Design a protein with these regions (language model features):
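Basic, amphipathic "hinge/linker" alpha-helix immediately C-terminal to the N-terminal HTH DNA-binding motif
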Residues: 69-92
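N-terminal helix-turn-helix DNA-binding core of bacterial DNA-binding proteins
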Residues: 4-49, 73-76
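Residues within the DNA-recognition helix of helix-turn-helix
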Residues: 53
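Hydrophobic alpha-helical core bundles mediating ligand binding, dimerization, or RNAP-core interactions
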Residues: 10, 14, 90-97, 101
Length: 104
């Protein structure tokens, strides 16, 4: 395939989504806001990698980080409208995986 024919926006979207754990982080947040520790334990992801992914997704405008001034401080992560727009894509991947992939 001629590389010049690939849409730059599509290429950027694939670059974002192909980062390890990114799709799973977004998928977890489809259910609603989550705290860091909840995300970390639900995916068996290292804290360092999760922190990197959340920062990347926040910079891309896909995830919102909200700090609640309580004692102790509570921080929740949720999807922005841009992030929620990925729901149909992830649901289709989920359907495809259930039909075509074997459970391990």
């Amino acid at each position: 395939m001629n590389q010049a024919l690939i849409c730059p926006r599509f290429e950027k979207a694939m670059s974002i989504m192909s980062q390890r754990w990114t799709g799973l982080v977004i998928y977890q947040l489809l259910a609603g806001p989550k705290r860091f520790c909840t995300l970390e334990s639900s995916m068996s992801i290292s804290g360092r990698v999760l922190s990197e992914r959340l920062k990347d997704l926040e910079q891309q405008g896909i995830v919102k980080r909200e700090v609640y001034p309580e004692t102790p401080v509570r921080i929740e992560y949720s999807l922005t409208d841009k992030g929620m727009a990925l729901e149909p894509v992830l649901r289709e991947i989920e359907k495809w995986s259930q039909e075509w992939l074997q459970a391990e």
